[in-house]
């Protein structure tokens, strides 16, 4: 006699077998290709993310993966190579400085960068300024101005607008949070402290921000452009690997950062012997700036627009003496060369004086 299991029991066995199968994880995807065209969105957070993403696309989409490896960098900040938007790299950085209103005119070479709107001459002084001067805060300020964010004052220093958010929360577009207790969303910013000799974290940075002496501090902030709980947060920052670079950080299923990689002060140096020290995501992540809801942003004063700077027109350059390779400008003739008489053959030497 053949024994047959009841049909309901067979169904239970089938469901149990399915439960033992691994659950497929949703594949994380870069949100920037879809976002970069939404710069005219009525939603301010979307506009912020869109301008940041469009800039990353212009730099050929370099990125830092979840393990902190930098990839895809094709063009560097001071090169004359064209970006995907046909603007030379050094010119694009000068545009971030100029259009954000943060160009420090007192610094060497900065004044020549102000001519970017009227001249495409590859100024060596401007390019030296771009190499020597961190421009990540200028990039953030450029994005926020393009997006029309109210309650945000751009600055050449990240610390200035972080301190402003901390001290003036009711008049600011951002609210300060500990990055380990906040859920990142598009339009937010995640910031770390650049101090090799000390780890700050949220509490020590908060103490510095509240101090009356206005102490300076090197910082860096990335703009959140996407967040996929259980997968990754996507952030875009300027002057990262000398480009505008996308960064990926792991997110837990609840939307919080999952084990945010943080420096400890005893991390190994980056070397072939200790590659674990080469993680570009390993930083002193100290503060998150949380974008306020749209209804609250609408009550803030409109974004500050500085008065237009009158930039004198550069004289047209017909030739150069200290020529830059690839500029397309011809070299000036030597000053001791005699002019060729009109109508004579330049290939033949002029006859000596007094010769008939």
Ranges and model annotations:
Residues 28-70:
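N-terminal module-boundary/linker segments of secreted carbohydrate-active enzymes
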């Amino acid at each position: 006699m053949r024994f047959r299991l009841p049909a309901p029991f067979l169904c239970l066995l089938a469901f149990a077998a399915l439960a033992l199968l691994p659950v497929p994880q949703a594949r994380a995807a870069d949100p920037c290709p879809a976002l970069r065209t939404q710069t005219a969105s009525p939603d301010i957070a979307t506009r912020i993310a869109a301008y940041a993403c469009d800039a990353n696309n212009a730099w050929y989409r370099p990125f830092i993966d979840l393990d902190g490896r930098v990839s895809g960098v094709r063009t560097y900040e001071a090169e004359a190579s064209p970006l995907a938007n046909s603007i030379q790299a050094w010119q694009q950085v000068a545009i971030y400085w100029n259009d954000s209103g943060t160009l420090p005119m007192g610094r060497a070479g900065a004044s020549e960068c102000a001519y970017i709107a009227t001249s495409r001459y590859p100024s060596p002084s401007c390019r030296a300024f771009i190499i020597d001067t961190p421009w990540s805060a200028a990039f953030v300020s450029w994005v926020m101005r393009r997006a029309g964010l109210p309650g945000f004052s751009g600055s050449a220093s990240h610390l200035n607008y972080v301190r402003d958010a901390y001290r003036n929360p009711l008049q600011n577009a951002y609210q300060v949070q500990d990055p380990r207790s906040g859920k990142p969303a598009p339009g937010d910013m995640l910031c770390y402290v650049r101090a090799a000799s000390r780890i700050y974290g949220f509490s020590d940075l908060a103490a510095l921000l509240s101090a009356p002496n206005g102490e300076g501090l090197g910082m860096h902030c990335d703009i959140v452009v996407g967040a996929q709980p259980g997968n990754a947060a996507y952030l875009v920052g300027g002057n990262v690997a000398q480009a505008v670079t996308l960064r990926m950080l792991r997110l837990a299923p609840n939307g919080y950062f999952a084990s945010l990689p943080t420096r400890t002060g005893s991390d190994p140096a980056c070397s072939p012997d200790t590659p674990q020290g080469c993680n570009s995501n390993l930083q002193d992540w100290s503060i998150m700036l949380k974008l306020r809801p749209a209804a609250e942003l609408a009550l803030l004063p409109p974004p500050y627009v500085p008065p237009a700077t009158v930039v004198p027109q550069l004289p047209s350059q017909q030739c150069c003496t200290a020529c830059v390779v690839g500029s397309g400008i011809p070299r000036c003739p030597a000053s001791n060369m005699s002019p060729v008489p009109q109508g004579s053959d330049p290939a033949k030497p002029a006859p000596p004086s007094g010769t008939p």
